[in-house]
Amino acid sequence: MASEGDKLWGGRFVGSIDPIMEMFNSSVSYDQRMWSADIRGSQAYVKALEKAGLVSPTEMEHILTGLDQIHEEWSKGTFVLTKADEDIHTANERRLKELIGEPAGKLHTGRSRNDQVVTDMRLWLRDSCSALHLHLTRLIRTMVDRAAIEIDILFPGYTHMQRAQPIRWSHWILSHAVALCRDAERLGELRKRINVLPLGSGAIAGNPLGVDRELLRKELEFDSVSLNSMDATSERDFIAEFLFWASLCMTHLSKMSEDLIIYSTKEFSFVTLSDSYSTGSSLMPQKKNPDSLELIRSKAGRVFGRCSGFLMTLKGLPSTYNKDLQEDKEAMFDVYDTVCAVLQVASGVISTLQINKEGMEKALSPDMLATDIAYYLVRKGMPFRQAHGLSGKVVQLAETKGIALNKLSLEDLKSISPLFSNDVSKVWNYTNSVEQYTAAGGTAKSCVVAQVEQLRTWLKKTQESVI
């Protein structure tokens, strides 16, 4: 049983902490992931202490040397945690004292774990956002490249899960790529709000010892210094925003996965997943299950739960730091790991997906050209509302006769409107249908080519300004 007096905070305590409480209170099992960020923060802070005259140059060098050795131990996997290590800060400071002795006790001068932990988190999440951005842009590039190659393939577009209009397969791919581009842009904006220095704020009131926060900012490469010490040490809106960002990104990935799951069924047979991203059944040997996509879809729910759970934690807190905020790190780590894995799996699925061109084209049907009948009449000078009504009557007539739209005779069509003539036969061509949507953003080939080019330009600019 550990003595409370031996803790970093143990001066006013006597006796020992209950072992169950000690385990309950400990966070080192997961916050050790921030070991590098914690060391970087301490390296910067001791330089600020030296500038303020609170440690000598010799003491600073001893501390920096000790921190370098701790960094090496963590890097090599030889750092040994003890039961007394409450968190990553305690562990690193304990080890520093073992290595260099008394000067280690000066490192925490004027610093609280309140500003230390939030500095660690901002450093860790800043780097993690860069990694997520890289995985996200790789997925987008995979999608754009695929769209460029398969631009001539047509298949049904759906609304309300009903066949709607013919579109290009590439148009569907790019619809998801564009949404992910916005996610990448949002991640860049989020990183700006993460990249604010809290170190030097103390526990609540600030730092009274002349620590140069601008020096800290430069050392740790933050964009700015926090404005208010109470806000700096207690606010976790940047974590909440990260969790929301992840929830929205996962929503987009879940929707894409749902589409592909449907398209991969025998009833649709538009796509086939690679064996590398599928599994089978323990009972039914014919099964090829889209587990990769189903897991992506399910992971969205996991991320939503982390986001809503953390917001519920925050909404009940009074001002400044409370131990409830220990919940922030597990949510942050879990969501990062989840989204990072999902993006990599999604890239693999998209890059190896096999498409059934014949199946896609076979699924196109004349009833999907009903809107084109209305457009035909509009081009003949008829108001759209009237044209829409008459195209509905064309559909009704075909259903009454039990035939497809394109099997109606010219006489049948003329019985509905005298504007129909021999050129109506062009309406029954699916390529003609998609090629009429030439306004920017449409599914005509020229428009889809433009989308590909624009996204490739975006990718190039994004690569040049990596967050």
UniProtKB/Swiss-Prot annotation:
Keywords recorded for this protein, A-Z: Amino-acid biosynthesis, Arginine biosynthesis, Lyase, Urea cycle
Amino-acid biosynthesis: present as a keyword of the record?
yes
Residues annotated as the enzyme's active site: 160 (proton acceptor), 281 (proton donor)
Source superkingdom: Eukaryota
Catalytic reaction equation(s): 2-(N(omega)-L-arginino)succinate = fumarate + L-arginine
* Gene3D superfamilies registered for this protein in UniProt: Fumarase/aspartase (C-terminal domain), Fumarase/aspartase (Central domain), Fumarase/aspartase (N-terminal domain)
* Residues the entry annotates as binding 2-(N(omega)-L-arginino)succinate: 27, 114, 159, 289, 321, 326, 329
Q: What class of enzyme is it?
A: lyase
Q: Where is this site: Increases basicity of active site His?
A: 294
GO-annotated molecular function: argininosuccinate lyase activity
Extract one GO cellular component term from the record: cytosol
Q: Which Pfam families match?
A: ASL_C2, Lyase_1
Keyword Lyase included in the entry's annotation:
yes
The record's EC number reads 4.3.2.1
Q: What is one GO biological process annotated to this record? A: L-arginine biosynthetic process
InterPro entries on file: Arg_succ_lyase_C, Argininosuccinate_lyase, Fumarase/histidase_N, Fumarate_lyase_CS, Fumarate_lyase_fam, Fumarate_lyase_N, L-Aspartase-like
Pathway in which this enzyme or protein is active: Amino-acid biosynthesis; L-arginine biosynthesis; L-arginine from L-ornithine and carbamoyl phosphate: step 3/3; Nitrogen metabolism; urea cycle; L-arginine and fumarate from (N(omega)-L-arginino)succinate: step 1/1
Instruction: Kindly state the subunit structure of this protein.
Output: Homotetramer.
Q: Which HAMAP family match?
A: Arg_succ_lyase (MF_00006)
Q: Which family does it belong to?
A: Belongs to the lyase 1 family. Argininosuccinate lyase subfamily.
* Protein name from the UniProt record: Argininosuccinate lyase
